[in-house]
């Protein structure tokens, strides 16, 4: 059996770029709050940013070509008649935005905006939010080990029903993209061996060779020896997003991480990772990969090493205290229904 979680070649922005402006939240967030994305666009302005290479879902399907032609102010930017907003991205049709994304990706790859910072390795992520410090390891998964069909018992499985109609627009965005900017989080059931982790605080370089021996709390163990790793970034995140640090896991340490997760895979009983966030993004990656396999354009040997076979994800521990599981639905009691509906209508109109 091949490993389903593997090292990657990972790109980041060059050192001259403001990372606080470079980093934006996942594209499927704030889908009913246009003011949030307007503020992000204003804050980023003309600076290099991942805002320019993602498609916030709030804008999907909102502007047709005819509407764009009618509302354009002549500079390619639509004036919103109701709010007076003037934003570049709120004015684009889906096709225009996707073309812009693909072009900008190519530009970032050729003009030095992006550079490879990790070769055949991983990134250890430390994300501070209101709920605490969440740790993760970024690497590649094999999409042949994942399926969003609940009937398939794969190593990597979805945690929510996939809305098939949501996949085609995402496929259109992904299929010609030169780079991948994921927000997919996978959860591993890996109870933390606190005694072993506490014992390696202040660790020295040799402790990296012990990662493969860790049976429980792989991510937490790597974090405990983070001072032996090369720091890649350390920045505040915009719009109250918290703080983030990243460390390169390379060389022997990367080999040890691969071995540790391979051992976890062997003992998991056939279910290693659950998709905690980004279900539809990963379903889109899977769909693109299946389309490539069915295209007949590649030999079996070529498919084995095709880049679309893999997706970049962050592995997080299900046992992390910083993970909060909240219900999607809310029950309102003792309210006047008409007043409540009027309030909701007024709030939506503001958007």
What annotation goes with each model-predicted range?
Residues 1-232:
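N-terminal extension/subdomain marker
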Residues 49-51, 182-184, 271, 308-314:
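Structural beta-strand/beta-sheet cores of well-ordered domains, especially the beta-sheet scaffolds
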Residues 171-176, 265, 272, 301-302:
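A generic local secondary-structure boundary/capping motif
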Residues 204-240, 327-348:
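Compact, glycine/acidic-enriched structural inserts
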Residues 235-257:
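Portal/gating segments that form or line small-molecule/metal binding sites
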Residues 239, 254-296:
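Active-site beta-strand/loop microenvironment that shapes enzyme catalytic pockets
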Residues 277-344:
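Catalytic or ion-translocation cores adjacent to nucleophile or general acid/base/metal-coordination motifs
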